[in-house]
C-alpha cells in the first residue's frame, strides 16, 4: 500500500513505518499470535471508512449517513456466520479481550464462579488472571495440564467442575499446542448445569479451514480475534446462538464500546471473504504441516517441547535444562533476526518477565510461502542462535537470505 502521503506530513512516523517494514521483511517472525494481512485487508483499514461514526448496529444507528457502512458490517456478519456455521455473529469488538468481556457480562454476574485454564499452563490473561478485569470481577477457578502428558487434564476439569459448580466453563488458550476436545468440555459443563464458552483466538483460522475441530456446535459462546491464524485486521469477533446473541449485542454496545471501527469491520469482511476461499484452507493445512515439521526438527536437535510436539500452529520450547531463560532465548534469537516471545512453561520456577520457555508459531512464515523444507533450516537457525550466541550475525545473514527468497510483499509499494 502506498503510504507516501505520510512522508511530507510526518517524516518521523514515516521513517518508523519504513524501519518496521524492513524489520518484518528481513526477519523471521515466529511469534505464534502474529501474521501478515493481505494488501486488500490493509487497504480497507486505510480507506475513507475510517471517517464514519456509526454507533449502533446495521439499520439501527444513532447517526445518519450509514447506508454504506451498514452494508459493510452486514457483509462481515454474514461471512462470519457462513465461515463458522454460527447462528449469530458480532463483528464490532475492538479486540479479543473486549470480546471476552462482553461474553462474560452477557451470561454471568460479578462474583460468579468460572472455571478456566491457568495462565501459567497456557491460558490467557482474560481467563481469570488477578491482574485482569476478569480476575477482579469474577471468582475464577483454574484447571491445568497433566504432569505426565502436559496436556489438558480432563479428569481434573471434571472434578473441579463438580466441586465448584461454576456458572461458566471456558476452554481455549494462548499457548497450548494440542487439539482441544470441545465435546468433552461441553459434556462436563452440561453435567453441572454450566454454560460453556470457547476462546478460539489462536486457532480460529484452523477451525475455519477444518484442520481443528470446531467449538461452535458445542459451545454457548465462541470468541476470537480476527488476526492471528485468521489473517485479518486486529480486532475481535463473537459467535453464539440467536437466543444469547441479543444479550451480547447490548453488552458490546452500549455496554462496553461506543462507536464501532467501521474501517476495521470492513477489513474483517475482506479477511472473512479470503478465509472462505479454497486457498485459505490449503494455507491452514500448510501452517499445521510446517509446525509439525519444525517441532520434530527441533526435538531431533535436542530441544524439549511441552507435550513433546504439536497438533496446531504453535509449540512451546521448555529451556529449563538448557541453562538459559526464556528472556535470554528471546534476546539471543532477536539478535539473529528471529522474533519469538518468552513464555511460561508448566510449573515454571521463573517469573512472567523471565520465564523458562519460548513460544514459536508458523502462521507468518507460512504466509511467506515457506514449507516443510524451510522448516528444517529454521530449526537449525534457532538451535545455532540459542546454543552459539556469538554466531548471531552469521545466523542473521542466513535469515536475511532465507527471507529474501520468500518476500512478504513481492512489490515494494509499502515504501511510498
From Swiss-Prot:
Protein residues bound to (6S)-5,6,7,8-tetrahydrofolate: 119, 123-125, 243
Catalytically driven reaction(s): (6R)-5,10-methylene-5,6,7,8-tetrahydrofolate + glycine + H2O = (6S)-5,6,7,8-tetrahydrofolate + L-serine
Gene3D superfamilies: Aspartate Aminotransferase, domain 1, Type I PLP-dependent aspartate aminotransferase-like (Major domain)
N6-(pyridoxal phosphate)lysine modification, residue list: 228
A GO term, aspect molecular function: glycine hydroxymethyltransferase activity
InterPro entries tied to this protein: PyrdxlP-dep_Trfase, PyrdxlP-dep_Trfase_major, PyrdxlP-dep_Trfase_small, Ser_HO-MeTrfase, Ser_HO-MeTrfase-like, Ser_HO-MeTrfase_PLP_BS, SHMT-like_dom
Pathway(s) annotated for this protein in UniProt: One-carbon metabolism; tetrahydrofolate interconversion; Amino-acid biosynthesis; glycine biosynthesis; glycine from L-serine: step 1/1
Keywords: Amino-acid biosynthesis, Cytoplasm, One-carbon metabolism, Pyridoxal phosphate, Transferase
Cell compartment(s), UniProt: Cytoplasm
EC number(s) on file: 2.1.2.1
One annotated Gene Ontology cellular component of this protein: cytosol
PANTHER family linked to this entry: SERINE HYDROXYMETHYLTRANSFERASE
Record function comment: Catalyzes the reversible interconversion of serine and glycine with tetrahydrofolate (THF) serving as the one-carbon carrier. This reaction serves as the major source of one-carbon groups required for the biosynthesis of purines, thymidylate, methionine, and other important biomolecules. Also exhibits THF-independent aldolase activity toward beta-hydroxyamino acids, producing glycine and aldehydes, via a retro-aldol mechanism.
Quaternary structure and partners: Homodimer.
Name the UniProt record assigns to this protein: Serine hydroxymethyltransferase
Lineage: Bacteria, Pseudomonadati, Thermodesulfobacteriota, Desulfobacteria, Desulfobacterales
Designated gene of the protein: glyA
Amino acid at each position: 500500500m502506498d503510504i507516501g502521503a505520510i512522508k511530507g506530513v510526518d517524516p518521523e512516523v514515516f521513517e518508523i513505518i519504513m524501519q518496521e517494514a524492513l524489520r518484518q521483511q528481513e526477519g523471521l517472525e515466529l511469534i505464534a499470535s502474529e501474521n501478515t494481512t493481505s494488501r486488500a485487508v490493509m487497504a480497507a483499514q486505510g480507506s475513507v471508512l475510517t471517517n464514519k461514526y456509526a454507533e449502533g448496529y446495521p439499520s439501527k444507528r444513532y447517526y445518519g449517513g450509514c447506508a454504506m457502512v451498514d452494508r459493510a458490517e452486514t457483509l462481515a456478519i454474514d461471512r462470519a456466520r457462513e465461515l463458522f456455521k454460527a447462528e449469530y455473529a458480532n463483528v464490532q469488538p475492538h479486540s479479543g479481550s473486549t470480546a471476552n468481556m462482553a461474553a462474560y457480562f452477557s451470561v454471568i454476574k460479578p462474583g460468579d464462579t468460572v472455571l478456566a485454564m491457568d495462565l501459567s499452563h497456557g491460558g490467557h490473561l482474560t481467563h481469570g488472571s488477578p491482574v485482569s478485569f476478569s480476575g477482579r470481577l469474577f471468582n475464577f477457578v483454574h484447571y491445568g495440564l497433566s504432569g505426565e502428558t502436559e496436556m489438558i487434564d480432563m479428569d481434573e476439569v471434571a472434578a473441579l467442575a463438580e466441586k465448584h459448580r461454576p456458572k461458566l466453563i471456558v476452554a481455549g488458550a494462548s499457548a497450548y499446542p494440542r487439539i482441544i476436545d470441545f465435546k468433552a468440555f461441553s459434556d462436563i459443563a452440561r453435567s453441572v448445569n454450566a454454560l460453556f464458552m470457547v476462546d478460539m483466538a489462536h486457532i480460529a483460522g484452523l477451525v475455519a479451514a477444518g484442520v481443528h475441530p470446531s467449538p461452535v456446535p458445542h459451545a454457548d459462546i465462541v470468541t476470537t480475534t480476527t488476526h492471528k491464524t485468521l489473517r485479518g485486521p486486529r480486532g475481535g469477533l463473537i459467535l453464539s446462538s440467536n437466543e444469547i446473541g441479543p444479550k451480547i449485542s447490548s453488552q458490546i454496545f452500549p455496554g462496553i464500546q461506543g462507536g464501532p471501527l467501521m474501517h476495521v469491520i470492513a477489513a474483517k469482511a475482506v479477511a472473512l471473504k479470503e478465509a472462505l476461499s479454497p486457498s485459505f484452507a490449503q494455507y491452514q493445512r500448510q501452517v499445521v504441516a510446517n509446525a509439525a515439521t519444525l517441532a520434530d526438527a527441533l526435538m531431533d536437535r535436542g530441544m524439549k517441547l511441552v507435550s513433546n510436539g504439536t497438533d496446531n500452529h504453535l509449540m512451546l520450547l521448555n529451556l529449563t535444562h538448557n541453562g538459559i531463560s526464556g528472556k535470554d532465548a528471546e534476546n539471543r534469537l532477536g539478535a539473529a533476526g528471529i522474533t519469538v516471545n518468552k513464555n511460561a512453561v508448566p510449573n515454571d520456577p521463573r517469573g512472567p518477565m523471565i520465564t523458562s520457555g519460548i513460544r514459536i508459531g508458523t502462521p507468518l512464515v507460512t504466509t511467506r510461502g515457506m514449507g516443510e523444507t524451510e522448516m528444517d533450516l529454521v530449526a537449525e537457525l534457532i538451535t545455532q542462535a540459542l546454543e552459539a550466541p556469538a554466531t548471531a550475525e552469521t545466523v542473521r545473514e542466513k535469515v536475511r537470505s532465507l527471507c529474501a527468497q520468500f518476500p512478504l510483499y513481492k512489490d515494494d509499494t509499502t515504501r511510498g
